[in-house]
Curated annotation (Swiss-Prot):
Keywords: Nucleus, rRNA processing. InterPro entries: Skp_dom_sf, SSU_processome_Utp11. It comes from the Eukaryota. Involved in nucleolar processing of pre-18S ribosomal RNA. Pfam families: Utp11 (PF03998). Belongs to the UTP11 family. GO terms for cellular component: nucleolus; small-subunit processome. This is Probable U3 small nucleolar RNA-associated protein 11.
Amino acid sequence: MSNFKNIIPKRTYLERGQAKHRLHLGELEKKVDYGKRREIYKKKKKIENVLKEKIMTKNPDEFHTGMVHSRVTEDNVLVREEKVLKKEVQLKNKRQELKEQTNDLYNKLKKINKRLSNYQMNIPLRYVFNNSHELYNENEIYTLKAENKKLKKRGDLIQKKYNGLINMKKNLLDQIRKLDNKYITTYHKVDGYNIVTDKGKTPYRLYQPRLK
């Protein structure tokens, strides 16, 4: 008989909603929220019990390999010793860092040179920057000025961008000159600059890309 009772569809009872005058007390917790909170609490409790057991069964004279390269200070702070690398490995790492720095700087310089050449090739700078053009006749000189305000604004913007690119180029060249270049040599001059090694040092040959 009980099996037949379960077949008959019954009304599904919804959970009670929260009244508006009690919203200031916070959201009403539903059964799903309680289940999630219960699972999280049980997980934390398990971890806590495992850690408690470890502390209770810990041997004070226990040794592990991490103690060789680390120590605990009076303030109970763990201090680890730095790894001592061979000179060959240190030189290799230094060369790799310098190689990455120089490549990055030269790539940036190449992009700036390309943009500058585009400005010079595609835009007649003397017309746009000065906003004037001189016409020579047999006896007289005429100056034609751009009266259009939009053209003047455009010319000023292009001039600012052009000057900014030149300043960026100067800064990049200064950064390249300031690099610690004891172990790097370049065989291509870039804008009249070439890296030279110190005497007696073993150079690391780094071939840089050709630039204008």
